């Protein structure tokens, strides 16, 4: 039950972040209105229909579904009544010009065994690489993922101190490509690891090795398929927001 406080809140933009912020503010009792310049919600996570076919626009990989579920739970709703997804395994299949196909399974052991069977790298070397990326995640997640960067107090915690103390272990002084070439002998594995730089429009030859945390997130923590496509994330969150009283105004630049 939302405890009303009669205060008003305006959110600019009905992208996923804007919708999420609106849901959180509504749960704090604010009367929330969202203004969006476009005629549709979602921002980058939108959709387009042509000739009877619908295409998801923008993001194509879904990780950390628990952060979406969190908004429903916060609102006292069952996530599965709004939004469903399934686990992808294998996460990817990679097709190369030489005709070879490499499967990226969700599971550290399976991934390493599968890749070792089809490349010149050993299972042990691949496991070692994934363990290094896991270490990067453990040192950086609490700073960049689990807490707000806009609150000064979040910088004065034991976890942040641990991250700073181990700064040299997160690959910040290496490029992604350099770190990946040191880790793998097979150029296909280097290529697979390097491609994660494209997620934020970066180059693996310029980006810090810290971004090698992304393979860990997808391979070990998992990637998922939202039933109904990626746009179902937007649709479900908009429905939740409306159900708890958030007002939307579209085409209002």
PLM region spans:
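Generic recognition of stable, solvent-exposed alpha-helical segments in well-folded globular domains
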Residues: 14, 20, 67, 110, ...
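Active-site substrate-recognition segment that forms the wall
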Residues: 81, 204-205, 240
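N-terminal glycine-rich phosphate/pyrophosphate-binding loop and immediately adjacent elements
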Residues: 2-139
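Generic, well-ordered alpha-helical scaffold segments in large soluble proteins
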Residues: 19, 24, 28, 179-183, ...
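Active-site-proximal loop/short-helix segments
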Residues: 206-214
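Alpha-helix capping and helix-loop boundary segments enriched in small/acidic/polar residues
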Residues: 56-59, 205, 224-228
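Helical element adjacent to the flavin cofactor pocket in flavoenzyme catalytic cores
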Residues: 213-253
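Rossmann-like flavin
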Residues: 97-206
């Amino acid at each position: 039950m939302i405890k009303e406080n009669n205060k008003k809140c305006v959110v600019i933009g009905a992208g996923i972040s804007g919708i999420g912020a609106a849901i959180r503010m509504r749960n704090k009792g604010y009367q929330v209105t969202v203004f969006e310049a476009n005629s549709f919600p979602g921002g980058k996570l939108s959709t387009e229909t042509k000739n009877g076919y619908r295409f998801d626009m923008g993001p194509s990989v879904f990780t950390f579904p628990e952060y979406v579920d969190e908004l429903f739970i916060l609102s006292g709703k069952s996530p599965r009544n709004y939004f469903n997804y399934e686990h992808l395994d294998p996460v990817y299949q990679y097709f190369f010009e030489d005709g070879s196909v490499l499967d990226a399974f969700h599971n550290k052991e399976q991934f390493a065994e599968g890749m070792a069977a089809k490349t010149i790298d050993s299972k042990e070397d691949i496991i070692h690489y994934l363990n290094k990326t896991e270490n990067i995640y453990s040192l950086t997640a609490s700073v960049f993922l689990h807490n707000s960067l806009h609150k000064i107090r979040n910088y004065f915690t034991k976890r942040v101190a641990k991250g700073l103390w181990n700064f040299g272990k997160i690959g910040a002084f290496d490029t992604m490509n350099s770190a990946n070439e040191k880790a793998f002998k097979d150029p296909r594995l280097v290529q697979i690891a390097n491609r994660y730089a494209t997620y934020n429009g970066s180059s693996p030859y310029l980006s810090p090795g810290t971004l090698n945390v992304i393979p860990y997130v997808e391979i070990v923590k998992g990637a998922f398929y939202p039933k109904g496509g990626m746009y179902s994330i937007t649709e479900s969150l908009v429905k939740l927001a409306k159900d708890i009283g958030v007002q939307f105004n579209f085409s209002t630049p």
